[in-house]
Amino acid sequence: MRPIKKSRSLKLPKSILEEIGESDSSARRGKRNHNLPHREKRKFARISRGKNGYENRKITEEGDSKSSELNDDYLDAHRKSSTKKKSSQNKQAKESKLLDPIAFQHKIALEEDDREIAHLEKMLGIKSKDKSAHSKIDKEFGWLLEDLDQEIDDIGVPGTEDPSYGHSEDSEVSDDTGDHGSVDELESEREGNSGEEEEEFHGFESNSDEFHQPETKPIRMDPLKPAVPSLPNANVGSKYVPPSLRKKLGGDKESEDALRLRRKLQGSLNKLSIANISSIIKEIEVLYMENSRHSVTSTITNLLLQTVMGRESMLDQLAIVYAALATALYRIVGNDFGAHLLQTLVERFLQLYKSKEKEPLSSHKETSNLIVFFVELYNFQLVSCVLVYDLIRLFLRSLTELNVEMLLKIVLNCGGQLRSDDPTSLQDIVTEMNLLLASADPSTISVRTKFMVESITNLKENKKTKVANASAQSKFEAVNQLKKFLGSLGNRSLNAREPLRVTLEDIEQIETKGRWWLVGASWNNVPSGDNTLSTEALQDKKKSEELTAHSKILQAAKKLRLNSTLRTSIFVALVGSEDYIDAWERVLKLHLKRNQLPEIAYVILHCVGNEKLYNPFYGLVALKCCTLQHNLKKSFQFSLWDFFNELQPDDDSEEREISMRRIVNLAKLYASLVIEAAQPLTILKHVDFMAINAQMQTFLLVFFTDIILGVKDDLQLVKIFENCKAEKNLSSKVDWFLKTYVRKNPLVDNSKKALFKSNLAMASAILQSISKEEI
């Protein structure tokens, strides 16, 4: 890039100079020479003395010194090729310089213009010295070059028309004939000026930005925003749509992945049965690993509800298997699955119930099927009794045919579970029902309504109806088998163990209060002002009371010699609970390992043995343990056999004296477990009936007396003693003990002697028949 001057003096056109004349030109020469810079004066003086022999120097395309540029423009365009005429050409050039010094200054100005034009041509992308390039000049900057050409024409510098100013390459050899000292001096001066001229050039580049359109600067990416280019058709002010709603906005067309997932789940549900439920759960777990959790959860929920709602009559066996599958997935996957299923189920049920409330009962097949499926979910402990009681209160608003049918479905399928979970709420339900019946016309009460009222009343009084139906028996066996399967899931790590405690209000107000199954997602209206202060005071008081009670419980644990941290934690969970259900839930929250489960049985038996009188609370907790955890059931058996070793030690060991209250309380505890089928009668297989001592005799006497008096009906008594078939010769041993010790039991009240004798005779007959079969 050629260096240029930052500014130059004003130049007059040739026509004006001719009009002024020779006299004016001489004065103008003096004035012009006077205003020249110091360096230009020195150059002009050297040229005037004829000491410069360095006019014609070879000009290269990449040269940037000022001397080469001056000599290039100063020489004439027509140079001669012969080397013999070099001296004459140099003389003519010197004479032309001496004749008109003003033309030399104009030549310098012309050189500056050429450099400026070359720079602009380069910036505009135009090849230099190309006349056709004027047609390619941008329309915006064409006026700039046109003015520069006009200015050159006005100056009219001699030498551009004079052929005597040679411009051939051969004439460059004559530069060496001059004075070498003057050449070196000129070279140093030109090199000294190169720095200033480069600075002037950079300044020109900064000013030349005004002649160009501003280029787009690279945009710096924001690290806090995703590096995704904006779409050309995207709306800048459009509202953000979450991924969960994009499918609804995009239409009902499902993707291939969703269809493939739906087919796989549908195939798994079609193969579902009690025998292969474990393998089906493993297949669904694999689908959870391969797909998004929400997709699998929503697809399973829709398929289950569609299958349940699509049947004319819901078979109990099918509802039980589907409910067991849903409960198992709830425990394995977590609260998200169970909450989504329960929320969707109740919403669809309420929608159907409210839309068809006044229609005949025959049009409520879907509603009836959904309530049966919901009841089975409650039986398998996916949902707590709170929501069930809320639905019962909803149905008790009016005794319509639909409400009576819904109440019967609930009472007949899960009445016993409701009574054991919350008997107080059941009493409130009976009270509301009686008030509703009192206000109704007796003539309008149907037979179905009377049967429903009778069933709820019997449930409150714990009167079980005798049902000898084969389907009911098969259903009972299927439920027990699936409950054992769900209990076996405790061997693996589970994400949910407790039933979902949700109310009907939470489900109905999910849009306003938020998702009830997420911690912190629901919103409650907190009162302000004095009410807030009083609430905080009550909370502080409650916390202080809890701390005091907790310290007392720890002291009681020390007195009972529960010194280990694990046993103390189990004791605090049991004693600090509100009821046996709360106690079981607190024990589950400890998340004990498999090898730590026997400690639960140890603490319960230890607490029972130290009570002054038998506390049925521990029996109910033990019943929960044996029913829901097979490992705990075995732990209670092993603990009983250890207790037998204490009661009747071996011949080598000394007999220990055990307190009577411990013997009686433990006998009553295990008798209650045998009555509820939580433990079989074969737990006595290690007892040597022919060599029992007084302590063992007392235990067995209390044990069999409670069983004979505690059974509800003959069928239950038959089931208990038929378990002796599993152990050979156990029936004959038990029969001998009943005839020898139990028949003459003085502890039986006179009011119960008749019942005691009849049940004892039936038990003896059962045992004798088993003994004959073994022979």
Curated annotation (Swiss-Prot):
Location within or outside the cell: Nucleus, Nucleolus
Residues covered by the MIF4G domain: 262-463
PROSITE patterns named in the record: MI
Alphabetized InterPro entries for the sequence: ARM-type_fold, CWC22_splicing_factor, Initiation_fac_eIF4g_MI, MIF4G-like_typ-3
Keywords: Nucleus
Coiled coil: none
Residues spanning the signal sequence: none
GO BP term, pick one: ribosomal small subunit biogenesis
Residue stretches of biased makeup (Basic and acidic residues): 52-79, 177-193, 209-223
Chief place where the protein resides: nucleus
Source organism superkingdom: Eukaryota
GO (cellular component) term, any one: nucleolus
Positions with biased composition (Basic residues): 1-11, 28-49
Alphabetized GO MF terms: RNA binding
MI domain span: 565-689
Region of interest called Disordered, as start-end residue ranges on this chain: 1-101, 152-253
Family affiliation: Belongs to the CWC22 family.
Role, per record: Involved in osmoregulatory glycerol response.
Record protein name field: Suppressor of glycerol defect protein 1
Organism for this UniProt entry: Schizosaccharomyces pombe (strain 972 / ATCC 24843)
